[in-house]
Amino acid sequence: MYTDYEGRQHRFGQRHNACPNSLVYRKYARALADKLAERYASNPHVTCWHVNNEYGITCFCDNCQNAFRVWLKDKYKTIDALNKAWNMEFWGHTVYDWDDVVVPNALSEGIGTEKTAFAGISIDYRRFNSDSVLECYKMERDAIRSHNADVVITINLMGTFKDL
């Protein structure tokens, strides 16, 4: 289950409720796409696949925090490069270890309901989240393609949704 900007882990019952970096979610999302594609691969009435619906959840859980650190290491290579890119000397926010990096939410540098005091971490977290959601799409797409390489696969996004 996903954790919102305020740090609250949600429970069952909402329309979008999965963390895109949850290994459990990914396992079952892939399995579901695989089983459906296997069953309907040769059905002539299936002309295309719609994967997920309106991707766009931004999760702030421990899975995301750990994956964000890995994403940052890949992008910046060193803590010094990260500190420079984010101008972390400002207000004495220098980080000395990758484990010092926390998700930018209301429990860390939050200002208001959706932004933080440091643009660098906020922008990178949105980029990371976009990459995480893209990985989920590709995972489901590839599961479908393994049964029907030529089928059209699509998604839909909300035109005014700013998080991707």
Where on the chain are the PLM-derived regions?
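Polysaccharide-binding and catalytic clefts of secreted carbohydrate-active enzymes
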Residues: Y2-L164
